[in-house]
């Protein structure tokens, strides 16, 4: 799969999920137009750490050597390549649409992520099942 972008991901990471969803929405298909490498976060591969010393996911390595380390940057890049639903055009033409998209992303990064973590990892936060 030489020449394809490579996405380093972890299936349960919400930011990696967002990157995978963004790539799929832009028409990228794992194994066809993007290589997906699931990472064991307990044993991060050396090539991931070479690309991104912080070792977090998602990371998208582009064929030209550029590296994207944030899910929103990956989403933006994917939609720059192919935007089948014209989301970028709609956002640029309609400020209200862009503001709504930003507000939804902020909600997903803030309160939703806070509660999602407590639901998925209750032992980390001392949460007991009612």
Regions found by a protein language model. Give the residues of each.
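GST-like domain detector, emphasizing the conserved glutathione-binding G-site
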Residues: 1-130
């Amino acid at each position: 799969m030489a020449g394809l972008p490579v996405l380093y991901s972890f299936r349960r990471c919400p930011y990696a999920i967002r990157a995978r969803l963004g790539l799929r929405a832009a028409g990228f298909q794992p194994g066809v137009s993007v290589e997906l490498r699931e990472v064991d976060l307990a044993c991060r591969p050396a090539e991931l750490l070479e690309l991104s010393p912080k070792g977090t996911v998602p990371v998208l390595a582009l064929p030209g050597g550029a590296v994207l380390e944030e899910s929103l940057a990956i989403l933006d890049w994917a939609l720059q390549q192919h935007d089948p639903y014209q989301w970028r055009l709609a956002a640029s033409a309609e400020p209200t649409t862009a503001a709504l998209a930003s507000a939804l992303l902020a909600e997903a990064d803030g309160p939703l992520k806070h509660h999602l973590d407590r639901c998925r990892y209750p032992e980390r936060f001392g949460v007991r099942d009612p």
